[in-house]
Amino acid sequence: KDSIIDAIDEIYKKLNDKKSARASVFRKKSYGIEQNCVTTGLPAYKRYDDVFLSRESYVKREWSKDEKQDKIKNTISDIIKDFSECKGYKFTKELEELITEKGNNSYVAIVSLDGNKMGQKIQHMKDEARKKEDKNNMAESNNIYIAKLKEFSDNIKKYYKNAFIDMLNVIDKNYDKVSESLKLKDNIMPVRPIILAGDDVCFICNAKIALECVSLFIKSLNKHSVEDEQLNAC
């Protein structure tokens, strides 16, 4: 039986080859005789909230409605549910509710964080697994590596999720001061998660608290280690 490590490496090689050989992304969007989508520039499919949207944008907005999001269980929906139901916060979808001051002070921050040295951590795990491979019993060696890989993935997901929750908890504990400083209304949480997928994190927040939010997130993350290395992000 072949090594699962070799099989995974081969899959990633084929994936990279496919990405490198992808077709041109250029395409004709309009013939100049139709109404265009305000978001994508593609031909409009339907009027939605007084603006024209392509079918792509229309479907996305429909699925962004709360009642449909609730059907999809994921990290973001779990966090929003906990902080909404248990602590009464509202996670807005409107940037205007995050940008509480107008004019020169109307700034919003888009924060994107990515785990540091993840490739090195995975390579270290692979190297250690290689040393312990039993060529006479590859099935067992493969099962051990699969379990190790799952543990690695689960830990990354857990630690990054917990770091985000820790950040929100600090905002919660200081909400009166934060709310007064940012002029928040209706118990708005000044942070809106966009992506929480393993070590890929993206959220939108009021620009005044962006650096502090990042600092809180990274400090929480630094408390944990994977493959004998401290977790970090930038």
Question: Positions of the model-derived regions?
Answer:
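Regulatory and interdomain segments flanking nucleotide-handling catalytic cores
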Residues: 1-234
